[in-house]
Amino acid sequence: MSKNNYYPYPPTLGKVFLFKRGPEIVSMESSETIQPADKLESILNSTSTITAELLFNTFDIPGISSKTDKLKLLFQKAFEQGINPNIQDSSGNTLLLYACQSSLVEVVQFLLKKGANPNISNNSDNTPLSKIISNRFIDKTEIYIAKLLLQNGALTELKDFVGFTPIQSATQYGHTEIVKSLIQNGADINVIASIETNSYYSGKSLVESVPSNKPELKALLTLTKACKDNNFSIVDNTITAKDIVEFIDWQLSITPENSRFFDKHLSELDNLKNFLETKELVSNETIQKINEHITSYSTTEISSPDVTPSFINEAEHQEYNLAGETDKSAPETA
């Protein structure tokens, strides 16, 4: 979606826009129009003060995806001049949200390193993560960006404007790879859609919200819940041996580097191993592989990836009222 869809009118000379620095709203006089791509170099070489509006306008420059190095230099220059990396436009959108929306991976990484907060919601209660998830079709780049956000402190339980958490939305859209990342980062899989959402999903669990053309996602969520609760009575004959093998492959790919709650993961994996030992669903070799995985990490000191505490603390007290695989198949309503 173009940034201009968020402004009450396109950026033109002399218009006044509201921007937000943290809790403070400041009025900024517009003096720049959208710059063509070949002017980005001249902006960098200019001695003029960089305004917040100019930064937001850069996302509309044609071919900007091929000029991310210069864009990062521009942002760096702006930050050195005192612009807050978490500045918001009149709709509450941040630079990070636009970078995510434009699939500019290097810019997303740069902004996160500069202190961009992935948990700031815009006026529609959308964060960068929820904006990505709400796309009906997502590609590998968007999946990667979602993982980056989670690795850099994006919270798993912030609700969007409808009232859904990220894992609820990802499940409803059938975004299996993002669901996996959310689970690895501690997302609540027992969440029930509130009746207040007044939607098709009202009162439904995650498993009940899975699109009918995503049986593998339904199997993944069922097996995840069985492992967490150590209750495998919910594993019925709709879950195939192939589903179980794929689930095991995913579980074995989880490490302390890509999971915030690896100690819990090992416990759940042990539950799975004990269950499989009583069934003839997989080979003894596979069970042995699970056991070796558990043993190898049980004998070493585990340190979870760092999550910036300020993001979590800020999100809990936030009052912004102005605040992988390519997944190309559209979900069907069950």
Curated annotation (Swiss-Prot):
For this UniProt record, the keywords arranged alphabetically read as follows: ANK repeat, Repeat
Q: Which GO terms describe its cellular component?
A: cytoplasm
- A Pfam family annotated for this chain is Ank_2
The residue spans of each ANK repeat are 80-90, 91-120, 124-161, 162-191
Q: Does the keyword Disulfide bond apply?
A: no
Give the source's domain of life in one word.
Answer: Bacteria
Q: Which Gene3D superfamilies match?
A: Ankyrin repeat-containing domain (1.25.40.20)
Q: What is this protein called?
A: Putative ankyrin repeat protein RBE_0347
> Which lineage is the organism of this entry classified under, starting from the top rank?
Bacteria, Pseudomonadati, Pseudomonadota, Alphaproteobacteria, Rickettsiales
